Amino acid sequence: MCTAATYKTKDFYFGRTLDYEFSYGDEVTVTPRNFCFRFRHMSEVKTHYAMIGMAYVADDYPPYYDAVNEKGLGMAGLNFVGNAKYQDVQAGRENVAQFEFIPWILSQCATVLEARKVLEKMNLVGTPYSEKLPCASLHWMIADKDAAIVVECVEDGLHVYDNPVGVLTNNPPFPVQMFMLNNYMHVSPSQPENHFAKELPLATYSRGMGGLGLPGDLSSASRFAKVAFTKLHAISGESEAESVSQFFHILGSVEQQRGCCEVEPGKYEITIYTSCVNADKGIYYYTTYENHQIQAVDMHRENLDGDTLRRYPLVNEEQIRVVN
């Protein structure tokens, strides 16, 4: 289970939580422009846009969970179990394996509009990375500073949806998530007025009562509504520190604590990491469950004309600043 969001102040930000019961050994990974992408069904790509994101690098290949390229286009894959249905290889189409989807788009597209054009020719197939890394059931959000879309490959084919809220979680399918926001049209950051009955002297007794009815559980539909509301009402200054801090607060509204989401006896889903990328500057910020101090990797401090992945293991030890 995961949550992705966009946010815009002076710069454009893109990020997500990754919620699961264990980690594969994720690393912040920079793919430079001349790293050779060898695709399973398409020709290799030797020169492309550089990108930075979170990946589990296997056999010197970065299957990204989320990433942003040097042009400011971001993309994240989130669990879509039970609904994701990939296609068989088709002649005359650009056949892309599910685990290649993020590199395929970010290597060649600078904007959401360009990504839409690539998607028109693409066939998303269920080729697994390996026997040890089977196909993941995912859907994706792709976003730049001007637009966001959701891509879902289901039983009847590939669907692309405009995403006016810039948020994605998991099930149900995106159109249903958007429809269910109708349930919360009464929710407001302002204090409510008495519409129950004018003859009753009803009054607020606490701050925040305009938010009554906003869900607080950890289900994907509830997280979608909670983050959409939080993001659309969040106010931030335009500095980098203020913007990044506010982005982490937005996604912090749906963090999962160990013990609150049991997936099987004795195993619990937690927010393994939360990311926030300044897509304009190529800086990848993150926190982990064990370490709340924000870490940062700047892709532009790397040799982006190189041909070798740059990998940064996550800093997982809690950083506590003692002030006396």
Give residue spans per PLM region.
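Catalytic cofactor-binding cores of redox enzymes
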Residues: 121-159
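Short, surface-exposed beta-strand-loop junctions and turns on beta-sheet-rich folds
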Residues: 20-22, 81-83, 156-159, 166, ...
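Proteins synthesized as precursors that undergo proteolytic processing into mature forms
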Residues: 92-128, 240-248
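Broad, structure-driven detector of short, well-ordered beta-strand segments within folded domains
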Residues: 68, 149-153, 275
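A contiguous strand-loop segment
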Residues: 1-93, 126, 311-315, 322-324
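Beta-strand residues in well-ordered beta-sheet regions across diverse protein folds
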Residues: 15, 76-77, 152, 161, ...
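C-terminus-biased signal that marks the final domain/tail of proteins
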Residues: 1-13, 127-130, 135-136, 145-147, ...
